């Protein structure tokens, strides 16, 4: 990466920025790597918050847009950059959509977010309809459990984001379709065992494909744009 290789200015800025940090502050920022203060960390991992901060400087960013797991390092940036007379970026954070695998009871999505290093645990904008369906079908979605349930998270933050209703399609022999006008209503019915996980998954898979389909089509014949992201 040209940002780091043969770039003396970058590493000089790295040292300057690090002088404004304490070790305890660096540890608190390490959740951006999916780590906690309780984990045994290598020395190199303690360097990461400073590197991410200096990346913002080197890329001359006006806005940093990321998940809520990165808010600590971005708050550090907004605190330290003025002292160094560097341009202070606007920080915009959003809810993290969790990965599709079993979270093991983890309550912090920092540890369960989607990652490109595990394709089966993630939905990508270039996934085909078949890939989306396959991933959703094997996703962790315990019957009657809403906590840390990735399929219900999709419903809450994606299905209901741009729509005021969500339909679960079911064969008439299993009670027919179910229409929900709020996420809370859907969650309640699921927790009460009124919705089978497979019915929920199939409907979420269809909705996800509808969301991703135009994006997938746009990039299908623009490989140079796709490779850039």
Language model regions located:
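Divalent-metal (Mg2+/Mn2+/Ca2+)-assisted nucleotide/phosphate chemistry catalytic cores
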Residues: 1-93
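Conserved nucleotide- and phosphate/pyrophosphate-binding catalytic cores
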Residues: 53, 59, 71-229
């Amino acid at each position: 990466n040209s940002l780091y290789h043969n770039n003396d200015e970058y590493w000089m800025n790295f040292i300057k920025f690090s002088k404004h940090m304490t070790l305890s502050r660096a540890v608190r920022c390490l959740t951006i790597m999916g780590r906690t203060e309780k984990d045994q960390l290598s020395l190199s991992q303690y360097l990461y918050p400073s590197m991410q901060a200096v990346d913002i400087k080197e890329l001359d960013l006006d806005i940093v847009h990321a998940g809520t797991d990165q808010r600590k390092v971005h708050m550090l940036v907004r605190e330290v950059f003025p002292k160094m007379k560097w341009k202070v970026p606007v920080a915009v954070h959003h809810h993290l959509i969790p990965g599709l695998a079993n979270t093991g009871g983890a309550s912090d999505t920092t540890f369960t977010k989607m990652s490109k290093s595990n394709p089966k645990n993630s939905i990508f904008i270039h996934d085909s309809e078949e890939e989306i369906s396959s991933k959703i079908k094997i996703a962790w979605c315990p019957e009657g459990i809403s906590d840390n349930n990735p399929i219900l998270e999709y419903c809450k933050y994606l299905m209901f984001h741009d729509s005021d209703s969500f339909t679960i399609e079911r064969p008439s022999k299993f009670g027919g379709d179910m229409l929900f006008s709020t996420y809370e209503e859907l969650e309640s019915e699921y927790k009460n065992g009124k919705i089978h996980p497979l019915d929920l998954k199939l409907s979420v898979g269809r909705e996800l494909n509808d969301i991703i389909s135009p994006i997938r089509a746009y990039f299908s014949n623009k490989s140079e744009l796709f490779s850039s992201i």
